[in-house]
Curated annotation (Swiss-Prot):
Glycosylation (residues): N306, N530, N826
Catalytic activity entry: UDP-alpha-D-xylose + L-seryl-[protein] = 3-O-(beta-D-xylosyl)-L-seryl-[protein] + UDP + H(+)
Protein name: Xylosyltransferase
Cytoplasmic side: 1-14
Cofactor(s) named in the record: a divalent metal cation
SS bonds (residue pairs): C145-C173, C189-C427, C446-C459, C448-C457, C529-C811, C794-C822
Role this protein plays: Catalyzes the first step in biosynthesis of glycosaminoglycan. Transfers D-xylose from UDP-D-xylose to specific serine residues of the core protein. Initial enzyme in the biosynthesis of chondroitin sulfate and dermatan sulfate proteoglycans in fibroblasts and chondrocytes.
CC per GO annotation: endoplasmic reticulum membrane; Golgi membrane
Highest taxon in the source lineage: Eukaryota
Phylogenetic classification of the source organism: Eukaryota, Metazoa, Chordata, Tunicata, Ascidiacea
Length: 848
């Protein structure tokens, strides 16, 4: 009773307070209930998501079976993944909450990434689905604020898709209201300034130390499969791991990589692909995603080293393993080596960038976060497993904020890991050495050659030549160098390969030969009983002793009986087919006419092409294949001389009309290369063009002449028969309009007094009327064959019997010869090439 009376007195005295507290508790409970998750609704949504993912997996598995069949060359597919109806069904069920990973880039579905398909069981254990959420598909561009930043307005005016514009606008609005980035970030390193650990090469190695295992990530693109094979051959060891990411746009390379690496269980190809661009934020995303994969796939590697196909080792694997074993708790990154403020400005770290539509858009300036030190240098690194695990699985504030900050950063991979390590508890693991040498020639490598894909001027390293090998001598421990392109210079790669692992035996074939895939096309032609092309399979560039010698063309051919002109050779009476390779070589095009002239004494080579590499000083479209809409460059190589002089070149079109002229000076007191862009109005007239060389407008004396051919265009946007081809293949009609720079050509034409070829004009007008069919193809063949010749052919087979078995009896002739087998033909890409062949693992764990 006393307790009851006491409680009553308490309530009378504090009644108002009790009511107030009770009211507050009720309000809190109400809002808690309103904001708490609806468990039944969440369960319902979870089940819907599971059903949706299951449907995706079923469709992806169906697609996988079809892709497997394509990869292995099966004719009878369970389901054809190239069928637009099937792919439409697959992507129809896509939800933008599920980011399906990309496959072989078949089709033009750009709303989301597509599913990755596993060609064999050794490569992928499952079809992976990304966990990150992709942005909603924007139907209409709607900025959320009035954008006033000049750079952002410029980016919006140049972006083409609504989705990209929306990304730019969203970032710009957050920039303007100051919410895009945190003003400061936490620093947990106990050192006030940047810390660097010195890791010299030990004079001796402890044999009792457990050797490290390395996980190599190879980021590859293009078509140089042989160079990639050669790199794998020299860095391979059964104790290491290899994870290969093939660029989303390199379908040919992906197929070849999958085929070449099947026999090695410690090599995996990424089941996802990204289309990375120079300087793009996607480069860092690719690295982090790969690190996440290899952490999950392999549990016992110690170091992560990223390479490209343009890298090559300069020390043996054993020495690298010994060095890293000594410093297994360190991280190797190259710092910029200049003042921080200067590096930040040159790197664009004080600017905001957004990547979309395969472009890095500059949106404006930003302040660097307070509290941390921003560091950077090279994006080629060697990271220990502890840092890798922290970078992808950590969740502290510094890491989370840095990842967000670098989403809007140019060249993020060149700075992210440096900044993360220098400001975290791992700062004492930083070694200012990325264990490689890069061949920089900034006078040639910093030409703003990436302005078409990034709103910034950047630099790119140069290829190594034998004369650059002296740069490999450094005071710091280095184990790799870059860049090497065998299509530019193979001798330097041979030198390093032979130095590390010894010369190949005398008589080894193809040591100084190179083949590189250039093209895959389809072609069909009618024929009688002669052997006829059924389908062209691929074209490979061929170099020998550092010189381009031609193209190797692989094609299916068949014997076709007498049929109508429009019949398909593939439907011959007996279906007999063989596979052949043909060697096509360009005809000599440079003629020296006055060998006594100074020009003739110095001019070594001259050629015309369309893909001029300002950094390496070469034309990359080997053979000078020019079309009506090509940008044409004249490139000449000159020997050394004490005297220089002015060269005049005059360009004459197929109608014998002067179309352009240029004056330039030869290199002074040195050998060198000159490049002259020709100002020719498009479309160019198809046929034979002529370039004449004079010494400083001495037009009475032609020193040299160079031919090049403009080939008629057969397709427009991949479609045959477009009526616009008539105008394209006719070329510029008015002689007064043939020069794109509107130069006054009257005096040159008057001086040379060339007779216009009116018959050629009549023939050109007649030929250009054909926009499809046999007559257009014959015209193309005629122009191409004027500058190219088929030198030889060989049989793609194990035995000559293949030819005799395939040849119909009605086409057999006594004493008829059989083509040589390609494997016995030195120009063939199927002939032995031991320096790039991947073989079985040897007892020492290597394949070289």
């Amino acid at each position: 009773m006393s307790l009851h009376r006491t409680l009553r007195r308490f309530l009378r005295k504090w009644k108002a307070l009790v009511y107030a507290v009770s009211f507050i508790l009720l309000i809190q409970a109400f809002f808690t209930f309103q904001s708490s998750p609806n468990l039944m609704e969440e369960e319902h949504l979870r089940r819907l998501k599971e059903l949706q993912i299951k449907k995706h997996q079923e469709l992806a598995n169906s697609m996988l079976q079809g892709e497997r069949a394509l990869v292995h060359g099966r004719d009878k597919l369970v389901l054809n993944p190239r069928d637009p109806g099937f792919r439409e069904e697959f992507f129809k069920h896509s939800n933008n909450e599920i980011n399906i990973l990309e496959d072989h880039n078949i089709g033009q579905v750009d709303k989301m990434e597509k599913p990755v398909l596993k060609p064999n069981e050794n490569k992928f254990e499952e079809i992976h689905f990304a966990t990150e959420k992709v942005p909603e598909i924007i139907v209409k561009y709607q900025p959320k604020c009035d954008i006033t930043i000049k750079d952002s307005i410029s980016a919006l005016s140049r972006a083409t898709t609504d989705r990209c514009k929306q990304q730019i606008a969203d970032a710009a609005c957050k920039m303007q209201d100051g919410t895009l980035f945190p003003k400061s970030m936490p620093r947990t390193c106990k050192h006030e300034s940047k810390f660097t650990f010195d890791a010299p090469m030990p004079t001796s190695f402890d044999p009792d130390i457990r050797p490290v295992r390395i996980c190599y990530m190879l980021v590859v693109h293009g078509r140089a499969i042989r160079q990639l094979r050669r790199l794998l051959k020299v860095i391979y060891h059964r104790d290491h791991y290899y994870y290969i990411h093939v660029d989303k746009r390199s379908d040919y390379l992906l197929r070849e990589v999958l085929k070449e690496t099947e026999q090695y269980p410690n090599i995996k190809v990424a089941p996802w692909r990204m289309a990375t661009i120079w300087g793009g934020s996607s480069l860092l995303q690719t690295l982090l995603r790969a690190i996440s994969d290899v952490l999950r796939i392999w549990k016992d590697w110690d170091f992560f080293i990223n390479l490209s196909a343009l890298d090559f080792p300069i020390e043996k694997d054993e020495k690298l393993v010994q060095y890293l074993s000594k410093y297994r708790d360190k991280n190797f990154m190259k710092s910029h080596g200049r003042e921080d403020e200067k590096f930040i400005r040159k790197q664009g770290l004080n600017r905001v960038f957004v990547e979309c539509d395969q472009h890095m858009w500059r949106l404006g300036e930003r302040q660097l976060p307070e509290g941390i030190t921003v560091n950077g240098g090279s994006d080629w690194v060697a990271l220990n497993r502890r840092l890798c695990d922290f970078a992808v699985n950590g969740n502290d504030q510094l890491l989370t904020q840095l990842k967000h900050w670098y989403e809007y950063t140019l060249l993020p991979a060149e700075s992210f890991f440096h900044t993360l390590v220098q400001n975290s508890d791992l700062c004492e693991t930083f070694v200012d050495n990325n264990i490689r040498v890069t061949n920089w020639n900034r006078a040639r490598g910093c030409k703003c050659q990436y302005k078409h894909i990034v709103d910034w001027c950047g630099c790119s390293p140069n290829d190594f030549y034998p004369s650059d090998l002296v740069r490999l001598r450094t005071s710091r421990p280095v184990f790799f160098a870059r860049k090497f392109e065998e299509s530019i210079n193979q001798e330097v790669v041979n030198h390093l390969d032979f130095k590390l692992y010894g010369d190949y035996p005398p008589g080894t074939p193809a040591l100084h030969s190179l083949w590189e895939n250039a093209l895959r096309v389809n072609s069909k032609m009618p024929s009688d009983c002669n052997l006829s092309v059924v389908s062209m399979l691929q074209v490979e560039m061929h170099k020998k002793d550092e010189e381009f010698v031609g193209y190797v063309v692989t094609f299916d051919a068949g014997w076709v009986g007498r049929r109508g002109a429009g019949d398909d050779p593939a439907t011959s009476e007996d279906g007999s087919r063989v596979q052949l390779q043909a060697f096509l070589s360009p005809q000599p095009s440079l003629r020296i006419l006055d060998r006594s002239s100074n020009l003739a004494k110095r001019l070594e080579t001259a050629s015309v092409g369309t893909n001029w590499d300002v950094k390496e000083l070469v034309i990359r479209d080997w053979g000078g294949l020019v079309g009506p809409n090509s940008d044409v460059h004249l490139v000449a190589r000159w020997s050394r001389s004490e005297d220089d002089f002015v060269v005049t070149v005059v360009v004459i079109d197929p109608l014998n009309v002067v179309a352009d002229y240029n004056d330039f000076r030869t290199p002074s007191k040195a050998a060198g290369v000159t490049e002259t862009p020709l100002s020719l109005k498009k479309p160019l007239r198809p046929g034979r063009w002529l370039v004449r060389f004079y010494v400083q407008r001495q037009f009475t004396n032609i020193c040299a002449e160079l031919d090049f051919y403009v080939t008629p265009q057969e397709f427009k946007g991949g479609i045959e028969g477009d009526s616009v081809l008539r105008e394209i293949n006719r070329g510029v009609v008015d002689d007064a309009q043939v020069n794109a720079a509107n130069r006054n050509l009257y005096s040159i034409r008057t001086t040379l007094n060339l007779a216009r070829n009116n018959q050629a004009e009549t023939e050109l007008a007649s030929e250009s009327n054909h926009v499809a069919g046999l007559k257009l193809r014959n015209w193309v063949d005629f122009v191409v064959s004027s500058g190219w010749k088929a030198k030889d052919a060989c049989l793609v087979a194990q035995s000559p019997e293949t030819w005799r078995e395939a040849q119909p009896r009605r086409c057999f002739m006594p004493r008829q010869g059989t083509p040589n087998l390609c494997e016995n033909t030195n120009w063939s890409s199927l002939s032995p090439d031991p320096k790039t062949e991947l073989i079985s693992v040897k007892p020492d764990g290597r394949i070289r």
